């Protein structure tokens, strides 16, 4: 009897110790961040050093997740997810690299599975992703003293906005910021009121501003990026105006569809017209472009949500605008 009690006591103590150690290890794993002073923890580090302006580019979502895997694991540098990470950056880098020295950190971004959770439940995983991005950004600010473009698409845009909320009012950041291209995520009037140092672009060449838009068909009235009842702030990349006037496809200097090696596989000038929706603030694409031809691909989007094509539809306009704003910075 006594032996049995002692045995159960020891088993209970061991169980508590195991749970304690498991929790400690889990917390340590979550808290551990990459050493961004090590160039191996960057997808791009000082690529194109001769440029007068930098670009700090943040990768969009590339991992599907599942089975409780809500943040990208960076342990295996040869994994398919890490190759997709660099590939996704390559798909959009051509917008920026003609004008900028390129920096892009690896980070524990959230997976697509996170966006299937209720919005409040996403935040712990997004905070972990952001903890890496902010650490990388602080290292970048110490390593380079050049002016910079901050850029990101989708989750990358969300991370850009978070960076500006936290650091954008700091004199050094405000002085060095050429513009922030936060494409494919919302930013609302409420956020601008809460962070008055955030300024939306009003034209083609203003400096220190946020460039943002979310593309969708005329029929869409809700999306993951801009839920129903929410109005986002934006600018039309065809005219660089913030009014609701329609801009014809004649303003479109070229849609470019790129691959993971940064090659342009297809280019089409005068691709589409667009206007900013008065109620949603989203960028409505004219009916020449159809959801059948440009499907949402991912099940977190509905037909007519052109999120995956945001920068591809307006590639040449964006590329030209980056050059324009970086030039305007020096004037």
Language-model features and meaning:
Residues 1-8:
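N-terminal secretory signal peptides that target proteins for export/translocation
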Residues 12-23:
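Bacterial N-terminal signal peptides
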Residues 28-82:
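N-terminal low-complexity, Ser/Thr- and acidic-residue-enriched intrinsically disordered segments
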Residues 54-58, 103-106, 149, 179-182, ...:
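Structural recognition of the beta-strand scaffold that forms the well-ordered cores
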Residues 58-147, 290-331:
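Active-site catalytic motif of lipid deacylating hydrolases and related acyltransferases
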Residues 129-143, 166-315, 319-328:
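Surface cap/lid and interfacial helix-loop subdomains adjacent to catalytic sites
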Residues 152-156:
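Gly/Ala-rich beta-loop-alpha elbow adjacent to hydrolase catalytic centers
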Residues 159-163:
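Hydrolases whose catalytic domains are alpha/beta-hydrolase-1, hotdog thioesterase
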């Amino acid at each position: 009897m006594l032996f049995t009690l002692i045995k159960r006591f020891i088993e209970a103590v061991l169980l508590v110790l195991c749970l304690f150690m498991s929790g400690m290890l889990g917390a340590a794993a979550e808290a551990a961040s990459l050493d961004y002073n090590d160039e191996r923890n960057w997808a791009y580090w000082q690529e194109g050093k001769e440029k007068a302006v930098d670009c700090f580019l943040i990768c969009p979502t590339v991992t599907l997740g599942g089975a409780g895997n809500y943040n990208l694991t960076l342990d295996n540098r040869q994994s398919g997810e890490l190759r997709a990470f660099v590939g996704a950056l390559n798909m959009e880098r051509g917008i920026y690299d003609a004008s900028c020295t390129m920096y892009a950190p690896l980070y524990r971004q959230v997976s697509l599975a996170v966006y299937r959770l209720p919005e409040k439940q996403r935040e712990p995983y997004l905070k972990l992703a952001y903890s890496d991005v902010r650490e990388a950004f602080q290292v970048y600010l110490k390593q380079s003293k050049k002016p910079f473009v901050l850029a990101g698409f989708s989750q990358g845009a969300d991370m850009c906005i978070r960076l500006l909320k936290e650091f954008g009012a700091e004199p050094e950041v405000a002085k060095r910021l050429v513009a922030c291209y936060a494409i494919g995520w919302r930013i609302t009037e409420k956020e601008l009121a809460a962070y008055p140092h955030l300024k939306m672009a009003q034209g083609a060449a203003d400096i220190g501003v946020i460039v943002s838009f979310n593309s969708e068909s005329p029929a869409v009235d809700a999306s993951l990026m801009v839920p129903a009842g929410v109005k986002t702030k934006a600018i039309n990349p065809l005219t660089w105006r913030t009014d609701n006037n329609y801009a014809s496809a004649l303003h479109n200097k070229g849609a470019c569809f790129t691959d993971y090696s940064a090659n342009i596989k297809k280019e089409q000038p005068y691709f589409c017209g667009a206007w900013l929706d008065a109620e949603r603030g989203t960028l409505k694409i004219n009916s020449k472009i159809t959801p059948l031809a440009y499907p949402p691909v991912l099940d977190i989007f509905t037909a007519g949500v052109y999120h995956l094509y945001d920068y591809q539809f307006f590639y040449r306009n964006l590329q030209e605008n980056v050059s324009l704003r970086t030039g305007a910075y020096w004037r």
